[in-house]
Amino acid sequence: MKLKVVHRPVDPGHLEGLRTLPPVLARAYAARGIDGPGQLAHTLDRLLRVGSLEGIADAVALLLAHRRADGRVLVVGDFDADGATSSALIVRALRAWGWPEVDFLVPNRFEYGYGLTPEIVDLAAVRAPTLIVTVDNGISSIAGVAAARERGIDVLVTDHHLAGAVLPDANVIVNPNVPGATFGSRCLAGVGVAFYVMSALHRALDDPSLPSPAGWLDLVALGTVADVVPLDHNNRVLVAQGLQRIRAGRCTPGVRALLETGKRSLPGLVAADLGFAAGPRLNAAGRLDDMSIGIRCLITDSPTEALALAARLDQLNQERRAIEGRMQEEAIAAVRHLRDPDGDSGRGRRRHGLCLYDPGWHQGVVGLVAGRLKDRVRRPVIAFADAGAGELRGSARSVTGVHIRDVLDAVATRHPGLLGRFGGHAMAAGLTLPRDRLDEFAVAFDAEVERWQAGGSLADRIETDGPLAADEISLATAETLRAAGPWGQAFPEPSFDQRFRILRTRTVGERHLKMWVEVPGAGRRFDAIAFNFFQGREASEPVPEEALLVYRLDVNEYAGERRLQLLVDHLLE
């Protein structure tokens, strides 16, 4: 596939409103729709009104009713970082605010699958809850909610996933993505929804002696970044506030332990550190073991216990990386030999969507493999693993312009009975499928993705902020951009492109390419690194003497010294 570099358009009117900022930063902000300082304010008073989220007043009333009745609250979470931070936030808040009995339950993904299923309700019923609160799940749990209500258990669904045609018969639903919702942002993560519910509850309690939910914004920032939801202005406020508290050392022992285990310095923390250091360690529990380890890490007030649990999470993350590395190599090899839906060899027409399956793949890691491969082939990818009983469980990752959950919905509509359960977002989704219908599904999926891309694929394009002048490629510029975040999904960290002469290279850690480069004619040389450059490549593959690099500016801290480093995302001849 030939990739095309395109520059993000910059509205001159937006630039005018940002003229007091450094030019590189002003261009980056303007290209992301920022037209003035007001959109850069990250104070809590810039959040969308708590009361404007549909269902929130009813949620508060339900929670207060169970407190008055000395009821038992059971929080049922998802098995990822968003679910873990959501669970920890609500458990911490309710316990701190006087609810007599609050506990959590997170389903083992390998035994129970996703969401509030009837089987999970059976498990929950042993604890005799009067109220189940779902976090980061529940909007598709029709049967599970019904099972709970039949047992006389009230259900409060807090979720952010897209709703299906039928909603569960919960007592209350709080979800900015239900049909007809008018809340000003559809981008809240599950932990963002949980924060809004707890903020409304705290206001209703009207007791200044109770700790503010703002004290747990470190959890909100971690879950929001780790779940890769779009960083609209509302989410940027939540993340910025959480980062501010972490940098000042005002964070939960668990978040501190996860970051210290990941060798991150709290004072200089940026959003990417949450996504690359804390998030994967937390997610590793749900992928390989039991997410209750992660939730316990986030709930404990003991620094010693938090460090011990973080060490266990780090061990699981190392195991996950080893499993993922093997699966990734197998997936790359499979793509090379993939046959097209019409039976021709891979040299035939180009597939639009890829489905991959290996009987030895791990259920908890297929999502990571799909994501890595999607970045490599720049097409939607679904990776499948065996789920037992003749069923496959798949994890889908998509590219810009292809709403993967809607693609699956269209496949289900055109081919009734082909899919089992499915759900998700624009960029990620999960599904189940009979193993003997995988080939049939692969054809249907490819055709549906092709329909979505009928106007041309956006995935073949690499968007950048254009070239930098030689004197703009500097540590000062890198420091400015680093401090200007939070950057993330739908508000990407600035990247640039231009031709460099590659003076010298060496391989680092078997997969990474270290380079020393210079801008032709400028006489300035820079350190650069392309992570995972040799993933799927031969180490002996030659590197050109000159290339178009798509890169970001990074501050490399080592032995107390801060130096500029170029992070190379693409090397194009």
Where are the regions that the model predicts?
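Histidine-centered active-site/metal-ligand motif
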Residues: H160-H161, H362, H425, H512
